[in-house]
Amino acid sequence: MSSVNSHKKYDAILVAGEGKSSYKVHHQNKAFLTINGKCLVHYIVETLQQVESIRDIYVVGLKDELQQVFLTGHVDLSFPKRIHIVEQRSNLYENVWHTFLKSLKSENEEVPYTESHRDQAMLIVPCDAPLMTPQEVEYFTSHANMENYDHVLGLVSQKKLKYFYPQEGKPGIKMAYLHIKEDSFRINNLHLVKPLRIENREYIQKMYQYRYQRNFKNLVLFALSIFG
């Protein structure tokens, strides 16, 4: 597949907030879990700093805790990318939406409706992907066809992930998949999106809240919230 956005640059939102719909590990925000003495959110920032197609990085979450993590980890907030730390709101949707407005330099957070603003895309990145590489992000941003689409998300085929399955004598992990006609895929949570082009944004938080569809209760509640 050829590159379609090889020279475009995007701001990135790193979502590191917590709320009642977020999934915790050992009762802790995943962003602050440590591997080899370094928080997950620190790993992601280091990766994004090496991606050529990214301009500024906006990290949204518990501001005081994030500032302490970056201070302790000696993270330069101005080089090679400028890092903005944004206080979290009440849920994932509000975190992304209000951070996007900040990136537009809208001090009063009013929504601008010029065509250039409506076509402005941002990269949205999770805080719990410490193995993510700069090359992976660069490939995704350069191949996402934002000329013809308003939202592009990354997928990994089930076949590629079988290498991580438990094997004889070795631990591993199996994941839930999105099953479509072409194949079964795992969403990798890289999103390139034009927020002002997305209609019915109020459903985004509902989808996130009830995202674990193996829980039958979530399936029913999501259906009721949409059709009830």
Name what the model sees in each region:
Residues M132-G228:
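Conserved core of the sugar-phosphate nucleotidyltransferase
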Residues H27-V45:
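Short catalytic helix/loop segments, enriched in acidic residues and glycine
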Residues A121-V125:
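Short aromatic-hydrophobic micro-motifs that form the base-stacking/packing surface
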Residues T72-Q120, L131-M132:
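Short phosphate-binding loop-to-helix
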Residues T47-I54:
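Short, acidic, metal-binding catalytic loop of nucleotide-sugar glycosyltransferases
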